[in-house]
């Protein structure tokens, strides 16, 4: 039996908010050292449109910046903004030496290709970690650069929970460039050493595959798709999904799974706070390296 399992006790709920505060304290110390040298880390957030959820996310990021001592600038663009409008804004930020991190809040206006936007950001300022050169470094086994925030936050959650990842079997449910693919790469990297399977809606025997996972990362955005009988007893379940349903918010994992898992991250309050904390960490790193 792998020693990453926790059996017979019911799931321990892993509070991402507590871990995120520890990360933000680390960032705050790093920011203070830079400020002493006359350098103030500065994050620019571009948001196009009036999507309510996006504006909530941006406010949360601004609050985290304030907590960490990071300057933040918000650039609001209309929902009618074209790709060219957004690229022009990004280019101005790329050329501004006082801006160390650039984030274009998703979703982009309808018809605008977010991949082109990600590719337009200076890789040194790409605090989301989505630029092809940063993702390419990860593919090559180099995790020293700016990493996608949600996957790196999940690795931090696993480490803070004292989970032995080496030799574990991990299943990542979802294959997006934002979470699924980079998550699999991070779990497989040298020093983590999990054996990783990427699963998706076309995967045959999906339930059985998930049930074999010592570490299960659910990132598909389908409310409660992962049932309790998908979960290996004592395993570590990371719920990345967040969907609006009648009565509030729901993750990808059904509540009943907590009776089977050894650890589980809640929705909300699990992965979300860690994503923002790692964004702060990336902004600090970007400022240190520019």
Feature-to-residue mapping (PLM):
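Short, well-structured alpha-helical segments in soluble
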Residues: 85-97
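Rossmann-fold NAD(P)-binding glycine/threonine-rich loop
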Residues: 115-126, 135, 241-290
């Amino acid at each position: 039996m792998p020693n990453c399992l926790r059996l017979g006790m019911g799931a321990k709920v892993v509070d991402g908010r507590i871990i995120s505060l520890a990360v933000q304290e680390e960032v705050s110390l790093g920011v203070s050292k830079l400020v002493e040298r006359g350098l103030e880390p500065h994050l620019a957030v571009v948001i196009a449109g009036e999507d309510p959820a996006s504006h909530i996310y941006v406010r949360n990021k601004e609050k985290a910046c304030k907590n960490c001592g990071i300057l933040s600038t918000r650039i609001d663009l209309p929902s009618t903004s074209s790709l060219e409008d957004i690229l022009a804004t990004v280019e101005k930020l790329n050329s501004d030496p006082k801006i160390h991190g650039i984030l274009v809040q998703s979703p982009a206006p309808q018809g605008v290709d977010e991949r082109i936007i990600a590719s337009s950001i200076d890789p040194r300022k790409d605090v989301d970690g989505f630029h092809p050169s940063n993702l390419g470094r990860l593919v090559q086994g180099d995790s020293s650069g700016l990493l996608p925030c949600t996957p790196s936050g999940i690795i931090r959650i696993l480490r803070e929970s004292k989970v032995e990842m080496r030799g574990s079997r991990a299943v990542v449910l979802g294959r997006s460039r934002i979470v699924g693919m980079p998550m699999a790469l991070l779990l497989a990297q040298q020093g983590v050493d999990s054996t990783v399977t990427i699963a998706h809606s076309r995967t045959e025997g999906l339930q059985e595959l998930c049930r074999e996972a010592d570490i299960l990362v659910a990132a598909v955005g389908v409310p409660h798709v992962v049932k309790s009988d998908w979960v290996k007893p004592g395993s570590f379940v990371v719920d990345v999904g967040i969907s609006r349903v009648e009565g509030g918010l729901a993750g990808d994992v059904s509540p009943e799974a907590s009776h089977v898992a050894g650890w589980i991250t809640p929705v909300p309050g699990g992965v979300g706070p860690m994503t923002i904390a790692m964004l702060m960490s990336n902004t600090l790193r970007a400022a240190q390296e520019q």
